[in-house]
Amino acid sequence: MKLTDIKNGNLSAEWAEKGYELPKFDVEAVKAKTHAEPTWVHFGAGNIFRAFPAAILNDALNSGKYDRGVIVAESFDYEIVDKAYQPYDNLSLLVCLKSTGDIEKKVIASVTESLKADYSFGADWARLVEIFQAPSLQMISFTITEKGYGVAPADLERGLTPVLAMGKVTALLYERFKAGALPLTVQSMDNCSHNGDKVKAAVFAYASKWVEQGLVPAEFLAYVKDETKITFPWSMIDKITPRPDAKVQKMLADDGFEDNYTIVTEKHTFTAPFVNAEETQYLCIEDHYTNGRPPLELGGVLYCDRETVDKIEKMKVCTCLNPLHTAMSIYGCMLGYTLISAEMADEDLRSFIQKIGYIEAMPVVVDPGVLNPYEFIGAVINRRLPNPFMPDAPQRIATDTSQKLAIRFGETIKAYEARGLDKSNLVLIPLVLAGYARYLTGLDDNCQPFEISTDPLLAELQAIVAPLKVEAGEQDFSCLKALYSRTDVFGVDLYAVGLGEKIESMAKELFAGPGAVRATLHKYVKAR
């Protein structure tokens, strides 16, 4: 079985026998219609795109209620197009890995063209210009990571041929402006708060610079700032899409699916003709479009207003997912775990995050109305985190912890303050923060060194806890005041809100020698 069999019509009975879901629509007809009247271009040809936005559109096409595909453009790693898209007629296989052990396999046929978004690829760039000049184009979208929205001063000086993604997109928007100032929606689908504002700021930066340099008329800047023409909606996306997994690769090979190998590009992108991803997914988008949009609600997208998108983001980041991740990462690293799913089999750790979420954070959760916080956190604890197919590691999640604590825990503490709630209800959140001081020593619960994940404040914060030793006996913990009063790290001065002394007391227990992390965790979780 090969993906190219689908175009050739050479489909054996094996596809159905092995449980592979094939497209229910006329792939060639959709391709022709999309080429003639494109509606959607997506920048970022990585795994998350194929596993989520492209798969949603595939579901919409399978419904028979839509007839246009998506054109993908890659602005960074062009090998992905050459090696993971074009040899397979832009088809891919989505392998959905469920926590129950069940596996769904679906051919994704919604991507009709794959293009390299750079001037050095003349034909591809000319095609992108043609697409951006098309009145039918409704939306361009992105999964290029938060770093992809960066604007480098040097790139602003390259005129109308910048090399960074946002510069290229602005150049293409200029082509659309010249074609009649046609309307378009510019939609980030990256996992970062207020993502539409990041795209907007970048586009405005390039357009403003070009006007200043006399390269484009002032009307172009007015065009991208005119919300009747161009909009930059916010969205909240949530789905884990790891690298191609060796276990999945073997399972596909055993099925007789031949396109089962991993591709590693020179830029160290890990891709493949298949994508493995978790079953749970959320995509909530601000419904602010100027030229219509593809009906992605047919594939499960939730459209709402900007305020609701923001509430969903806060629900996830401050209560229902991210705080649990950070709690597990700090303690998981100290207890020697390398897989989040394995941590979920540890009763202390599982109870730890359950009680943080349900007992301590949920009383101040931001309820968006359109998604139930209890259902969301239930899916996290019961399906997502225990999923053995998701090889996520506490070491990865612990990266940049100093930049995450304020939003993931500080906001909850501030909400308790603002509402006049009893902060004695906060026990396990203080235990997470006490654990951070112990984590910074770089010693696990057996007092063996472990590699601390990268963090911009690591050396500075380690210097604060350096006087402390992991050993029994009396020692002076007053150095911790310099840590727990840091509003830049925790979002609040923990002493000013009445939690500093409680956290110090817990830290003393965690520093009491080998086995103290486990003993302290067990004590407080059981008592809670």
Locate each region found by the language model:
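Substrate/ligand-engaging "lid" and interaction regions
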Residues: 1-43, 47-528
